[in-house]
Amino acid sequence: MNNHIEALSYYLGAFVDELARLNVCDVVISPGSRSTPLALLMEQHEQIKTYLHVDERSAAFFALGMAKAKKQPVAILCTSGTAAANYYPAVCEAYHARVPLLVLTADRPHELRDVGAPQAMNQFNLYGSFVKQFMEMALPEAREPMYQYVRMAAGRAVASASFAPMGPVHMNFPLREPLIPDFSLDGLWEQGCGEYTNRVQQGSMTLTSEYIRSLIKRLSRLEKGLIVCGDDSHLELVEVIAEFAEKTGYPVLADPLSNLRTGSHNQTMIIDCYDTFLRNELLKDTWKPDIIIRFGGMPVSKALTQYIKKQESAVHIIVDESGKWRDPALMTTEVVSASDVAFCKAMTEHMQKREQNDWFKKWKHINDKTKETLREVEAYDTAFEGKVITDIVRILPEGATLFVSNSMPIRDADTFLFTNEKKIHVMANRGVNGIDGIISTALGASTVCEPLVLVIGDLSFYHDLNGLLAAKLHDLNITIVVVNNDGGGIFSFLPQYESKEHFESLFGTPLGLDYEHVVKMYGGSFVRVSGWEAFREEVQKGIIERGLHVVEICTNREENVQLHRKLWAKSVIEIKDMLQGDTE
């Protein structure tokens, strides 16, 4: 037998089998020659499910969506050259959003590097600081120690991707021709697998009893506190945060991605309209908390970030089990290096419940009054973008997923996604906050979460049209709501809008595209609606039926800005009297 083929088959067979043994059973593959042996072995392994995606950029975002939904590593595989470079945007997002990805790139062997060989470039540390770990893999050899080595490398990669903070790991495989493995070999999946093969078990970072007692004593003296919750991946966090908040008596400013706004948990302490009422300058200057305790990523709301920056006299505690806590406000005074779930459980177990005080009551009161104003959009007849969120939430069934794109949709979710006993899982790409790869990420998530509705603007939709191919190839079910204001709607809210001479060409960027034909090219249905009754009917139809459904609603950018500002101004006026004389 050809020793090279035997080495290639057993070495890569051991690697693929170890991935499956470690429960990395989903692989998104883009076609290419140098990655042939890995692709064939993955396709052949009975425990691994493969997804084909031709465009590497979309493929990587698709895997990102799966990994976000599963909360466990998903692998991506491509050939050498610029194919690997196209993974870069999704790798950056995965790193900053703390999503576990295994990035597997095939490469030319060392003798074909830097000599002008085709489809060869330097892939060493290709993703730089945007991966948790880079592994330059050894060339295949038909020796037992090499089979053990490649299994150990798989284990280390999965552990690195999975441990806090989760993130992407890059493994680069140099491979020589010929590239076709021999599936007739005995024990193809068994090489290097024995009693010594490691399993990595992640523990939970906890607090010392001394620290718990000390912090509880401090909290008992600090009556005016706030709990701020951003995007967080822990499934248990919703219940334990709600219980912790009730014990402390502190209001919870809950970002929509915290998933604290919806569900059957106790929502008494949840504040959901802070992005609107924190625009009031008097409130920012006079409502001074003694302590702010933060969990998860930084919330979407700019008004909240500005408010936090003003709280110079407060204690700012961030709970983060990694050493890379997130605080763009630069106000951290203490970092608790522990699992947020473990932190809340430990504190709640030993705390006495504080009765609701005036501090909580005034936050709750102003939140309720603000919500009354914002709910007026539910009666609007005009095509207002904020109402897209309120109407979809009404339609979605229990347990559904709402994926919101960056730019305006996530901000409208922040403003108009109110507390609701119906559980709706909210997702978005808030690592680097780009508009690229949104369709692909949502489609990846849809392999795990059904039904799923994506709300996306027309520019973001255009940016990832290639991603629609996954819905066709893999028979996926998704309803995509395209909010088409013919351009970049968010820029109308920013100072750039005042540059009238160049605004449309540089920022408004109207495309004037009709997306109907491209959606049908990918096997989907497309409908453009006018009127809210038709909108609700079509979204409901998309949720019930299988396949790709795109519902387009056209809005006016200028009118949308005016309606948003009208609501914010009305809210500010209504709460002004409530704040007069309140200087505490």
Swiss-Prot record:
The cofactor(s) it depends on are: Mg(2+); Mn(2+); thiamine diphosphate
* UniProt cofactor note: Binds 1 thiamine pyrophosphate per subunit.
GO annotations under biological process? menaquinone biosynthetic process
Q: Which GO terms describe its molecular function?
A: 2-succinyl-5-enolpyruvyl-6-hydroxy-3-cyclohexene-1-carboxylic-acid synthase activity; magnesium ion binding; manganese ion binding; thiamine pyrophosphate binding
Pfam family example for this protein?
TPP_enzyme_N
Claim: Transferase is one of the keywords in the record: yes
Its UniProt entry gives the catalysed reaction(s) as: isochorismate + 2-oxoglutarate + H(+) = 5-enolpyruvoyl-6-hydroxy-2-succinyl-cyclohex-3-ene-1-carboxylate + CO2
The record's keywords, sorted A to Z, are: Magnesium, Manganese, Menaquinone biosynthesis, Metal-binding, Thiamine pyrophosphate, Transferase
Instruction: State which Enzyme Commission number(s) the record gives.
Output: 2.2.1.9
Pathway involvement of the protein, from the record: Quinol/quinone metabolism; 1,4-dihydroxy-2-naphthoate biosynthesis; 1,4-dihydroxy-2-naphthoate from chorismate: step 2/7; Quinol/quinone metabolism; menaquinone biosynthesis
The record's annotation in HAMAP family points to: MenD
Q: How the protein assembles, per its UniProt entry?
A: Homodimer.
- Give the UniProt family note: Belongs to the TPP enzyme family. MenD subfamily.
The function of this protein is: Catalyzes the thiamine diphosphate-dependent decarboxylation of 2-oxoglutarate and the subsequent addition of the resulting succinic semialdehyde-thiamine pyrophosphate anion to isochorismate to yield 2-succinyl-5-enolpyruvyl-6-hydroxy-3-cyclohexene-1-carboxylate (SEPHCHC).
- What name does UniProt use for this protein? 2-succinyl-5-enolpyruvyl-6-hydroxy-3-cyclohexene-1-carboxylate synthase
Q: Which organism is it from?
A: Bacillus cytotoxicus (strain DSM 22905 / CIP 110041 / 391-98 / NVH 391-98)
